[in-house]
From Swiss-Prot:
The gene is cfap263. This is Cilia- and flagella-associated protein 263. One of its GO terms (biological process) is cilium assembly. Keywords: Cell projection, Cilium biogenesis/degradation, Coiled coil, Cytoplasm, Cytoskeleton. GO terms for cellular component: axoneme; centriolar satellite; ciliary basal body; protein-containing complex.
Length: 358
C-alpha cells in the first residue's frame, strides 16, 4: 500500500511538472511576441521621441485619480504599464495598416505593369502575325510557285531590309521625341527651380499645377522610354528572324541549285533515252522489213527435185575441182616466171647492161 501511495504521488508530481513546463512555454511565447512588438516599436523611434513619450506616460500614470503611485524599488526592473502597452500596440497596429496599404498600392502597381506588359505583348504578337502573313503572301508563295523559281534572293533581302529601315526610322523618330521631352522636362525643372528661388508671385496652386505637369511629363517620358526599349527588343528579334531567314534562304537556294542540276541531268538522260528509243524504233522497223522480206522469200522458195539437186551438186564439185586445177597451174606458171626472170637478170648483169625492170 505504501509503495502504491508513493507511486501515485510521484505520478501526480510529474503531471504537475509537465503542466508547469507547458505553462512556462506558453508564457515565454507570449513574452517573445511582446518583445518583438516592442522591438519594432522602438526601432521606429529616435532617442528624443522615446524619452518624451516615456516621460509623458509616467506623468499621465502618476496623475490618474484614484490610483496610487507605485513606489520604485531600487534594483527592481521597471515594467510598462497597461496604458504604455496600449500605446505601443496601437502604434504597431497603425504601422501594420500603413504597411498593408503600401503593399496593396505596390501590388496594384505591379499588377498594372503586368497587364500593360501583356497588352503590349498581345500588340507585338498581332504585329508579328501581320508581318508573317504579309511576308508569306508576298514572298513565300512566290517562292513556292514553280513559275518563279528563277527569282533570286535579292527580293527577299530587299523586303527584309525595307522592314528594318522602317523600324530604324520609327526608332529614330521616338529618339527625337524622347530628346524633345527630356529637353522640355529640363526646361520645366529649371523654371521650377527659378520660381522656387525667387518665391515671388507663386501660390500653392501653381506648385500643385507644376507638380501635376511634372508627373504627367514623367509618365509620358516613361511611356516613351518603354516604347523605345520595346522597339529595340523588336529590332533585335527582327535581326534574329532576319538571320534565321537568311540561313533558311541559303539552304533553300542550295536545295534549288541541287534540284536544278538534278533536273538538267534527268532532262539529258530523258533526251538520251528518247534518242535510243527512236533508234530502237528504227531498228525495229528495219527488222520488221527484213523479216517481211525473208518471209516473202521463204514463201517463194521451192525445194528442187532430188535428181536435179544431185546433178547440181556433182557439177558444183567438178567446178570446184576445175578451179583448184587452174589455181595449181597458175602457181606453176608464176614459179616458172620467177625462175625465168632471175635467169634473165643474171644474164643481163653478166653482160654489163645492168638490171632493167620488166
Amino acid at each position: 500500500m505504501a509503495e502504491m501511495t508513493e507511486d501515485s504521488k510521484s505520478d501526480t508530481a510529474r503531471k504537475q511538472l509537465v503542466e508547469l513546463v507547458d505553462l512556462n512555454l506558453t508564457s515565454n511565447a507570449a513574452l517573445n511576441a511582446e518583445i518583438d512588438l516592442f522591438d519594432r516599436y522602438i526601432s521606429r523611434l529616435d532617442l528624443r521621441t522615446f524619452e518624451t513619450v516615456w516621460k509623458w506616460q509616467n506623468l499621465s500614470t502618476e496623475k490618474i485619480p484614484g490610483r496610487k503611485a507605485k513606489v520604485r524599488t531600487p534594483g527592481r526592473q521597471q515594467l510598462l504599464t497597461l496604458e504604455q502597452k496600449c500605446v505601443v500596440a496601437k502604434s504597431v497596429y497603425k504601422k501594420m495598416i500603413e504597411d498593408l496599404k503600401i503593399a496593396k498600392i505596390h501590388s496594384e502597381k505591379q499588377l498594372d505593369n503586368y497587364k500593360a506588359t501583356l497588352e503590349e505583348a498581345d500588340i507585338h504578337l498581332a504585329e508579328i502575325k501581320k508581318e508573317r502573313s504579309h511576308f508569306k503572301r508576298n514572298i513565300v508563295e512566290e517562292l513556292e510557285d514553280k513559275k518563279s523559281m528563277t527569282m533570286s534572293a535579292e527580293k527577299v533581302m530587299r523586303y527584309i531590309e525595307d522592314k528594318i529601315k522602317a523600324k530604324d526610322i520609327l526608332i529614330e523618330k521616338l529618339h527625337r521625341k524622347n530628346s524633345a521631352l527630356l529637353t522640355h522636362k529640363k526646361k520645366q525643372q529649371a523654371q521650377l527651380r527659378q520660381q522656387e528661388e525667387m518665391a515671388e508671385g507663386v501660390t500653392v496652386l501653381d506648385f500643385e499645377l507644376l507638380k501635376f505637369e511634372n508627373i504627367r511629363f514623367r509618365k509620358q517620358l516613361d511611356e516613351q522610354n518603354l516604347k523605345q526599349v520595346n522597339l529595340k527588343l523588336l529590332a533585335v528579334k527582327t535581326l534574329q528572324t532576319l538571320n534565321s531567314n537568311k540561313e533558311k534562304l541559303h539552304i533553300l537556294t542550295n536545295e534549288s541549285e541541287m534540284l536544278s542540276s538534278d533536273t538538267a541531268l534527268r532532262t539529258k538522260l530523258l533526251v538520251k533515252i528518247e534518242e535510243e528509243t527512236e533508234q530502237a524504233e528504227e531498228e525495229r522497223h528495219k527488222a520488221e522489213a527484213l523479216n517481211r522480206k525473208l518471209r516473202d522469200q521463204l514463201a517463194d522458195f521451192h525445194v528442187p527435185h532430188v535428181l536435179q539437186y544431185i546433178k547440181l551438186k556433182e557439177s558444183h564439185g567438178q567446178l570446184q575441182k576445175s578451179v583448184r586445177e587452174w589455181e595449181r597451174k597458175v602457181e606453176i606458171a608464176e614459179m616458172a616466171l620467177k625462175t625465168y626472170t632471175k635467169s634473165w637478170d643474171k644474164l643481163r648483169f653478166a653482160a654489163g647492161a645492168g638490171l632493167v625492170p620488166i
